Amino acid sequence: LQKMGVEMALITNKPERFVAPLLDEMKLGRFFRWIIGGDTMPQKKPDPAALFFVMKMAGVPASQALFVGDSRSDVQAAKAAGVACVALSYGYNHGRPIAEENPAMVIDDLRKLIPGCLDMDAEILLPDIKRPSPRESIVVVTRKLWMKVIKALARWRWRA
Protein backbone atom coordinates (compact mmCIF):
# COMPACT_ATOMS: atom_id res chain seq x y z
CA LEU A 1 0.00 0.00 0.00
CA GLN A 2 2.77 2.36 0.88
CA LYS A 3 4.43 1.79 -2.50
CA MET A 4 1.09 2.49 -4.19
CA GLY A 5 0.84 5.85 -2.43
CA VAL A 6 -1.89 4.81 -0.01
CA GLU A 7 -1.40 6.50 3.32
CA MET A 8 -2.37 4.62 6.45
CA ALA A 9 -3.28 5.71 9.92
CA LEU A 10 -3.73 3.80 13.13
CA ILE A 11 -6.58 4.98 15.35
CA THR A 12 -7.05 3.38 18.73
CA ASN A 13 -8.59 4.33 22.05
CA LYS A 14 -5.47 3.06 23.82
CA PRO A 15 -3.06 5.78 25.01
CA GLU A 16 -0.64 6.87 22.30
CA ARG A 17 2.36 6.49 24.57
CA PHE A 18 1.83 2.70 24.53
CA VAL A 19 1.05 2.34 20.82
CA ALA A 20 3.97 4.11 19.13
CA PRO A 21 6.72 2.20 20.99
CA LEU A 22 5.00 -1.11 20.26
CA LEU A 23 4.75 -0.29 16.56
CA ASP A 24 8.40 0.72 16.48
CA GLU A 25 9.48 -2.43 18.31
CA MET A 26 7.62 -4.54 15.76
CA LYS A 27 9.09 -2.42 12.93
CA LEU A 28 5.63 -1.39 11.79
CA GLY A 29 5.62 2.25 12.79
CA ARG A 30 7.05 3.36 9.43
CA PHE A 31 3.92 2.15 7.64
CA PHE A 32 1.65 4.63 9.42
CA ARG A 33 1.78 8.31 8.67
CA TRP A 34 -0.53 9.07 11.59
CA ILE A 35 -0.91 7.33 14.95
CA ILE A 36 -3.89 8.59 16.91
CA GLY A 37 -4.25 7.29 20.44
CA GLY A 38 -7.14 7.70 22.83
CA ASP A 39 -5.31 10.59 24.47
CA THR A 40 -4.16 12.31 21.26
CA MET A 41 -7.41 14.18 20.77
CA PRO A 42 -10.07 15.34 23.24
CA GLN A 43 -12.56 12.80 21.83
CA LYS A 44 -12.26 9.02 21.55
CA LYS A 45 -14.09 6.64 19.22
CA PRO A 46 -16.96 6.33 18.54
CA ASP A 47 -16.59 10.09 18.05
CA PRO A 48 -15.37 10.54 14.45
CA ALA A 49 -12.96 13.39 15.28
CA ALA A 50 -9.83 11.27 14.72
CA LEU A 51 -11.09 10.08 11.33
CA PHE A 52 -11.92 13.64 10.28
CA PHE A 53 -8.47 14.77 11.42
CA VAL A 54 -6.67 12.07 9.41
CA MET A 55 -8.77 12.63 6.30
CA LYS A 56 -8.15 16.38 6.49
CA MET A 57 -4.41 15.89 6.92
CA ALA A 58 -4.34 13.42 4.01
CA GLY A 59 -6.57 15.55 1.82
CA VAL A 60 -8.84 12.55 1.26
CA PRO A 61 -12.65 12.71 1.23
CA ALA A 62 -14.67 10.15 3.18
CA SER A 63 -15.78 8.51 -0.07
CA GLN A 64 -12.17 7.50 -0.71
CA ALA A 65 -11.32 6.22 2.75
CA LEU A 66 -11.68 2.75 4.24
CA PHE A 67 -11.74 1.94 7.93
CA VAL A 68 -10.85 -1.57 9.13
CA GLY A 69 -12.03 -2.24 12.68
CA ASP A 70 -13.07 -4.87 15.15
CA SER A 71 -15.46 -3.16 17.53
CA ARG A 72 -18.77 -1.36 17.75
CA SER A 73 -17.03 1.94 18.38
CA ASP A 74 -14.97 1.44 15.22
CA VAL A 75 -18.05 0.94 13.04
CA GLN A 76 -19.88 3.82 14.71
CA ALA A 77 -16.92 6.16 14.22
CA ALA A 78 -16.62 5.20 10.56
CA LYS A 79 -20.34 5.70 9.96
CA ALA A 80 -20.32 9.06 11.74
CA ALA A 81 -17.44 10.14 9.50
CA GLY A 82 -19.14 8.83 6.35
CA VAL A 83 -16.38 6.27 5.80
CA ALA A 84 -16.94 2.67 4.67
CA CYS A 85 -15.98 0.13 7.30
CA VAL A 86 -14.77 -3.45 6.98
CA ALA A 87 -15.32 -5.12 10.34
CA LEU A 88 -13.75 -8.26 11.69
CA SER A 89 -16.05 -10.76 13.35
CA TYR A 90 -13.49 -11.30 16.10
CA GLY A 91 -11.96 -8.74 18.37
CA TYR A 92 -12.99 -6.43 21.13
CA ASN A 93 -16.76 -6.10 20.83
CA HIS A 94 -18.07 -7.08 24.26
CA GLY A 95 -19.36 -10.43 23.01
CA ARG A 96 -21.83 -8.92 20.54
CA PRO A 97 -21.79 -9.84 16.85
CA ILE A 98 -20.19 -7.00 14.92
CA ALA A 99 -22.71 -7.53 12.10
CA GLU A 100 -25.34 -5.91 14.36
CA GLU A 101 -23.60 -2.60 13.67
CA ASN A 102 -24.13 -2.96 9.88
CA PRO A 103 -20.63 -2.25 8.55
CA ALA A 104 -20.11 -2.27 4.77
CA MET A 105 -18.57 -5.74 5.07
CA VAL A 106 -17.94 -8.29 7.82
CA ILE A 107 -15.11 -10.77 7.47
CA ASP A 108 -13.96 -13.47 9.85
CA ASP A 109 -10.44 -13.71 8.51
CA LEU A 110 -8.25 -10.97 7.07
CA ARG A 111 -7.04 -13.48 4.50
CA LYS A 112 -10.41 -13.02 2.80
CA LEU A 113 -9.08 -9.66 1.67
CA ILE A 114 -6.00 -11.21 0.08
CA PRO A 115 -7.53 -12.05 -3.33
CA GLY A 116 -8.30 -8.38 -3.82
CA CYS A 117 -4.85 -7.48 -2.60
CA LEU A 118 -2.83 -9.87 -4.74
CA ASP A 119 -4.84 -10.12 -7.94
CA MET A 120 -5.47 -6.88 -9.79
CA ASP A 121 -8.48 -8.47 -11.54
CA ALA A 122 -10.09 -9.70 -8.31
CA GLU A 123 -12.66 -7.41 -6.83
CA ILE A 124 -13.96 -7.00 -3.33
CA LEU A 125 -17.44 -5.53 -3.35
CA LEU A 126 -18.25 -2.86 -0.82
CA PRO A 127 -21.67 -1.32 -1.35
CA ASP A 128 -21.91 2.42 -1.83
CA ILE A 129 -18.18 3.04 -2.24
CA LYS A 130 -16.76 4.98 -5.16
CA ARG A 131 -13.60 3.58 -6.72
CA PRO A 132 -10.76 5.93 -5.76
CA SER A 133 -7.59 6.44 -7.69
CA PRO A 134 -4.68 4.65 -5.95
CA ARG A 135 -3.05 7.92 -4.85
CA GLU A 136 -6.23 9.37 -3.42
CA SER A 137 -7.05 6.68 -0.90
CA ILE A 138 -6.37 6.04 2.73
CA VAL A 139 -6.81 3.05 4.96
CA VAL A 140 -7.45 3.57 8.64
CA VAL A 141 -6.68 0.61 10.88
CA THR A 142 -7.49 0.13 14.54
CA ARG A 143 -6.25 -1.82 17.53
CA LYS A 144 -4.27 -5.00 17.01
CA LEU A 145 -5.29 -5.29 13.37
CA TRP A 146 -2.32 -3.34 12.06
CA MET A 147 0.05 -6.32 12.16
CA LYS A 148 -2.22 -8.47 10.04
CA VAL A 149 -3.46 -5.70 7.78
CA ILE A 150 0.03 -4.66 6.71
CA LYS A 151 0.58 -8.17 5.38
CA ALA A 152 -2.89 -8.67 3.94
CA LEU A 153 -3.54 -5.31 2.31
CA ALA A 154 -0.50 -5.15 0.08
CA ARG A 155 -2.66 -4.25 -2.92
CA TRP A 156 -6.19 -3.30 -1.86
CA ARG A 157 -8.83 -3.18 -4.60
CA TRP A 158 -12.54 -2.49 -4.35
CA ARG A 159 -15.39 -1.22 -6.48
CA ALA A 160 -18.84 0.19 -5.95
Swiss-Prot record:
Its cofactor is Mg(2+). Pathway: Organic acid metabolism; glycolate biosynthesis; glycolate from 2-phosphoglycolate: step 1/1. GO terms for molecular function: metal ion binding; phosphoglycolate phosphatase activity. GO terms for cellular component: cytosol. InterPro entries: HAD-like_hydrolase_sf, HAD-like_sf, HAD-SF_hydro_IA, HAD_2, HAD_sf. Mg(2+) binds at residue 70. Keywords: Carbohydrate metabolism, Hydrolase, Magnesium, Metal-binding. It catalyses: 2-phosphoglycolate + H2O = glycolate + phosphate. Its EC number is 3.1.3.18. One of its GO terms (biological process) is glycolate biosynthetic process. NCBIfam families: HAD-SF-IA-v1, HAD-SF-IA-v3. Specifically catalyzes the dephosphorylation of 2-phosphoglycolate. Is involved in the dissimilation of the intracellular 2-phosphoglycolate formed during the DNA repair of 3'-phosphoglycolate ends, a major class of DNA lesions induced by oxidative stress. Belongs to the HAD-like hydrolase superfamily. CbbY/CbbZ/Gph/YieH family. This is Probable phosphoglycolate phosphatase. It comes from Pseudomonas savastanoi. The gene is gph.
